[in-house]
Curated annotation (Swiss-Prot):
InterPro entries: AMP-bd_C (IPR025110), AMP-bd_C_sf (IPR045851), AMP-binding_CS (IPR020845), AMP-dep_synth/lig_dom (IPR000873), ANL_N_sf (IPR042099), ATP-dep_AMP-bd_enzyme (IPR050237), MenE (IPR010192). Transmembrane segments: none annotated. One of its GO terms (biological process) is menaquinone biosynthetic process. The keyword Electron transport does not apply. This is 2-succinylbenzoate--CoA ligase. Gene3D superfamilies: 3.30.300.30, N-terminal domain of ligase-like. Pathway: Quinol/quinone metabolism; 1,4-dihydroxy-2-naphthoate biosynthesis; 1,4-dihydroxy-2-naphthoate from chorismate: step 5/7; Quinol/quinone metabolism; menaquinone biosynthesis. Its EC number is 6.2.1.26. The gene is menE. CDD domains: OSB_CoA_lg. PANTHER family: LONG-CHAIN-FATTY-ACID--COA LIGASE (PTHR43767), NONRIBOSOMAL PEPTIDE SYNTHASE PES1 (EUROFUNG)-RELATED (PTHR43767:SF1). Keywords: ATP-binding, Ligase, Menaquinone biosynthesis, Nucleotide-binding. It is an enzyme of class 6 (ligase). Belongs to the ATP-dependent AMP-binding enzyme family. MenE subfamily.
Length: 482
């Protein structure tokens, strides 16, 4: 098996220098122009002492600047630690400390404690020093670290190598195919693996990306009709928004794939897509699998409703219960394997050993396979709340609630929301006088906005089993009765 590959963007700029790489609003950048921008940033990163193997935090919104910085870090051999712009300052500082980053590159007004902070203007236009650019990428080396929340609530840094990203892009192309006129509309945040994976496909396939800096359903709807877009990645909420705008019409015949992630889609939504001739491919994946690992092709949209499909060509999947592989229709844990699967978590040897055994990743998600091998995901890590495509772990919110002196006990579950799918709801046992408003305000200071509970209810005691474990299912019943 090959150990190295030519520097991806540099090779792409050599092969197709004048082809459009990125379109953003009215700006177009070719692969050669992108390469030149990246080299300029490299020279400043070298000047400030960024070296191979060091970790650099990136806190930026979707845009040409973020793309340039991510590629520049790969050019100098540094590891990009991609931070979620929606997190609170405390959460960001914790992740930067945990990842042992040496500096932060950001397009925001952010003051870190112990590390230098550089704006994009500084890294683009600041003092330069000749950079030692990686001519080859070692597929075993780490390229990115992206944080994901564990069931304990403490985030874990998922290490993704050049080999993981390469395998993910190859698997996707074998699944969806490639066309010369392909253009992928990118509206997912690039700090998420789903958004980042499009940057990899962009340079590996030589495919045009239409980049949307911020989710804008009107712009996206119009772009699908007028900008030659052939593929887009969405979650159910986005698909619903687009169908509302589409009315009685449909999208051009050149549009060939609506890649749908973030949990199963409602059957009526899929039926509407079939009626309008919109091909929807449902997917299952996570940060640890470098994006999708299973996809249900549009051929099975209605005959396999609720299924996430079958594994990508070079991937394997099975269902285990108590360490034993179970037969079709038996429920158990989804376990996956493939060259796109992470080798582990940064500085979390115990979590890595627990999660990855003999190359198989234990996802913590529950599901089953039917008699034809199609995957059905039953629960995304049973306690997980998925709100507008964002993963929220109750344990992290509970940790914040319990840090308040007037809170004795806390339990958090998801409650149904028409707009976001789910939002957090908190149940609290008081140890002193406190109001719902005070609790929510306290959370706003400590958590990202989308993690703040939409409701806080007071109980005399939380439901627990004999071993005092919180019974979340009873809290869910209380939410349903509200």
């Amino acid at each position: 098996m090959m150990e190295t590959m030519p520097n991806w963007l540099k090779q792409r700029a050599f092969l197709t220098p004048d082809r459009t790489a990125i379109e953003i609003e009215e700006e177009k950048v070719t692969f050669m122009q992108l390469h030149e921008k990246v080299v300029s940033v490299c020279e400043h990163l070298t000047h400030v002492g960024v070296n191979r193997g060091q970790k650099v935090a990136v806190l930026m919104k979707n845009g040409m600047e973020m793309i340039t910085v991510i590629h520049a870090l790969s050019y100098v051999g540094a590891v990009a630690v991609l931070l979620n712009t929606r997190l609170s300052r405390e959460e960001l500082l914790w992740q930067m400390d945990d990842a042992e980053v040496i500096c932060l590159v950001t397009d925001q007004d952010f003051e870190a404690k112990d590390i230098p902070v550089y704006s994009f203007a500084e890294v683009m236009n600041g003092p330069k020093e000749e950079a030692s650019i990686q001519e080859e990428f070692s597929l075993r080396e780490a390229m990115t670290i992206i944080y994901t929340s564990g069931t304990t609530g403490k985030p874990k840094g998922v290490i993704l190598t050049y080999g993981n990203h390469w395998a993910s892009a190859v698997g996707s192309s074998l699944n969806l195919g490639l066309r010369d006129d392909d253009c992928w509309l990118a509206c997912m945040p690039m700090f998420h693996v789903g958004g980042l994976s499009l940057l990899m496909k962009n340079i590996m396939y030589g495919m045009r990306i239409l980049l949307v800096p911020k989710y804008d359903a009107d712009f996206i709807h119009k772009a699908l009709q007028t900008r030659g877009v052939t593929i887009i990645s969405v979650v159910s909420k986005m698909l619903t928004d687009l169908l509302e705008r589409l009315g009685e019409g449909t999208y051009p015949s050149s549009f060939r794939c609506m890649l749908l992630g973030g949990g199963p889609a409602p059957k009526p939504l899929l039926e509407t897509c079939v009626d309008k001739g919109i091909p929807v491919y449902q997917t299952y994946g996570m940060t640890e699998t470098s994006s999708q690992i299973c996809t249900l092709s549009a051929d099975y949209m209605l005959t396999k409703v609720g299924s996430a499909g079958k594994p990508l060509f070079q991937c394997q999947l099975r269902i285990e219960k108590d360490g034993v592989v179970v037969p079709p229709f038996a429920e158990g844990e989804i376990v996956v394997k493939g060259p796109n699967v992470t080798g582990g978590y940064f500085n979390r040897e115990d979590a890595t050993r627990e999660t990855i055994q003999n190359g198989w990743l234990h996802t913590g998600d529950l599901g089953y396979l039917d008699e034809e091998g199609f995957l059905y995901v039953l629960d995304r890590r049973s306690d997980l709340i998925i709100s507008g495509g964002e993963n929220i772990y109750p344990a992290q919110i509970e940790e914040v609630l319990l840090s308040h002196p007037m809170v004795a006990e806390a339990g958090v579950v998801g409650m149904t929301d028409d707009k976001w799918g789910q939002v957090p709801a908190a149940f609290v046992v008081k140890s002193g006088e406190i109001t719902e408003e005070e609790i929510l305000h306290f959370c706003e200071e400590k958590l990202a906005k989308y993690k703040v509970p939409k409701k806080a209810c007071f109980l005399e005691e939380l439901p627990r089993n004999a071993s005092k474990k919180l019974l979340r299912r009873e809290l869910r019943q209380l939410v349903e009765e509200m």
